[in-house]
From Swiss-Prot:
It is a peripheral membrane protein. Pathway: Cell wall biogenesis; peptidoglycan biosynthesis. It comes from Ruthia magnifica subsp. Calyptogena magnifica. This is UDP-N-acetylglucosamine--N-acetylmuramyl-(pentapeptide) pyrophosphoryl-undecaprenol N-acetylglucosamine transferase. HAMAP family: MurG (MF_00033).
Length: 338
C-alpha cells in the first residue's frame, strides 16, 4: 500500500519550490502525495500542473495586527484549523512534511493532535516563526544551513530543481545575470538599467516590471525577460549574478557554483536575507552590498574589479557550500517511517 504523505507549503516560492523538488523525488517511490496550501499563494497556479491534489484554506496573518483585526484573524484561524482537521481526517496521511508558512503552522499542530509524525524543513538561515514553534514538536527537523536551530537538526541544504550546472566558458566580456525573483525587484531593476560598462547582461525583471525595464535599456544587446524557466541554463551562462538573497536563490548559487553580488531585501522578516547573504560573503563566494549603500558608482566599480581569477575562486567556494542531495535525504527519511 502506498505511503500517504501530506506536504504543507504555501504563500511564496521560497516555501513552494523546495517542497516541489521533494514531491518530484517522492514520485520515484510508491507514495500518495497531497498538498496543503493557502488560497492566495502561487501554489494554486503551480502545484496542480504537477498532478498533485491541492487543498487550500484561507490564509490568516497575525503579525502587526491591530486589536480588532487580531480578533477577526483569530476567528478565521479557528475556521482554518477546522478545515485542516477535515482534510487530515479524509486523507489520513501517514506522515506530514511542513515547509513553513501559515498552513504549515496550523497543519503541524493538527498533526500533533492526531499523533501523526511531523517533519519540518527550514529554508532560511534565520528560522521563520512557524518553524520555531513546530521545531519543538517535530519528529525531525531539517535545515538548509548550519546553526539555524538550537535543538539538534540535520543540515540537508535546500532541495533544488536541478542537480548540477555545466558552466559555459566565456573568454570575452563578463556575463552578468540579474534576477529579482518571480515578482522582480524594483530597486535592482532601476539601478541595473543605469549600468554603462562593457559587459553582457541578461536581466530577469519580474512580470510587473518588464515593459518599464525594457524601455530603459538603451543597449539593445541586453537580454530582458520576465521570468526564467530554466534557471540551470541561466546560471550556466552567468559569470556573476546580481540578486536578492532569498534562501532558494542562495542555495542555487551554491549548487551552480556561481559568484554573486547580493543585495538583501532590507525589510525581510527578521532580516533573514542579510544572514542568508552573509553565508556566501563570509566564505568569499559572494559580495554583500546592503541596499542603503547601493549606488551605480559602487555597482560599476564592483563589477569592473571582478577578474577571472576571482570568479574562479568564488565559484569554487560557492560549490563547497552546496548540498546537492537535499531532496533525496529528506525523502529517504520520510520513507523510513512504517
Amino acid at each position: 500500500m502506498s505511503k500517504k504523505i501530506l506536504i504543507m507549503a504555501g504563500g511564496t516560492g521560497g516555501h513552494i519550490f523546495p517542497a516541489l523538488a521533494i514531491a518530484n523525488e517522492l514520485k520515484n517511490h510508491s507514495t500518495h502525495i497531497q498538498w496543503l496550501g493557502s488560497n492566495v499563494g502561487i501554489e494554486n497556479e503551480i502545484v496542480p500542473k504537477h498532478n498533485i491534489k491541492l487543498h487550500t484554506v484561507n490564509s490568516v496573518g497575525l503579525r502587526g495586527k491591530s486589536v480588532v483585526s487580531l480578533i477577526k484573524a483569530l476567528f478565521l484561524l479557528s475556521y482554518a484549523t477546522l478545515q485542516i482537521m477535515g482534510i487530515f481526517l479524509k486523507f489520513k496521511p501517514n506522515i506530514v512534511l511542513g515547509m513553513g508558512g501559515f498552513t504549515s503552522g496550523i497543519g503541524g499542530l493538527v498533526a500533533c493532535i492526531f499523533r501523526i509524525p511531523l517533519v519540518i524543513h527550514e529554508q532560511n538561515s534565520i528560522s521563520g516563526t512557524t518553524n520555531k514553534i513546530l521545531n519543538k514538536i517535530a519528529k525531525k527537523t531539517f535545515q538548509a544551513f548550519d546553526d539555524t536551530f538550537i535543538k539538534s537538526a540535520t543540515t540537508s541544504g535546500n532541495p533544488i530543481a536541478f542537480s548540477s550546472v555545466d558552466k559555459q566558458t566565456n573568454n570575452k566580456k563578463l556575463n552578468l545575470l540579474i534576477i529579482g525573483g518571480s515578482l522582480g525587484s524594483k530597486p535592482i531593476n532601476d539601478i541595473s538599467t543605469q549600468l554603462n560598462i562593457n559587459i553582457n547582461i541578461w536581466h530577469q525583471t519580474g512580470r510587473l516590471h518588464f515593459d518599464a525595464v525594457k524601455a530603459q535599456y538603451k543597449n539593445n544587446v541586453v537580454k530582458v525577460t520576465e521570468f526564467i524557466k530554466d534557471m540551470a541554463n541561466a546560471y550556466a551562462w552567468a559569470d556573476v549574478v546580481l540578486c536578492r538573497a532569498g534562501a532558494m536563490t542562495v542555495s542555487e548559487l551554491m549548487l551552480s557554483a556561481t559568484p554573486s553580488i547580493l543585495i538583501p531585501l532590507p525589510h525581510a522578516i527578521d532580516n533573514h536575507q542579510f544572514y542568508n547573504a552573509k553565508i556566501l560573503a563570509d566564505s568569499n563566494a559572494g559580495i554583500l552590498i546592503e541596499q542603503k549603500d547601493l549606488t551605480i558608482e559602487l555597482l560599476e566599480k564592483t563589477l569592473l574589479n571582478i577578474n577571472k581569477n576571482q570568479i574562479k575562486q568564488m565559484s569554487t567556494n560557492a560549490l563547497k557550500l552546496a548540498k546537492p542531495n537535499a531532496a533525496k535525504q529528506i525523502v529517504n527519511y520520510l520513507l523510513s517511517f512504517d
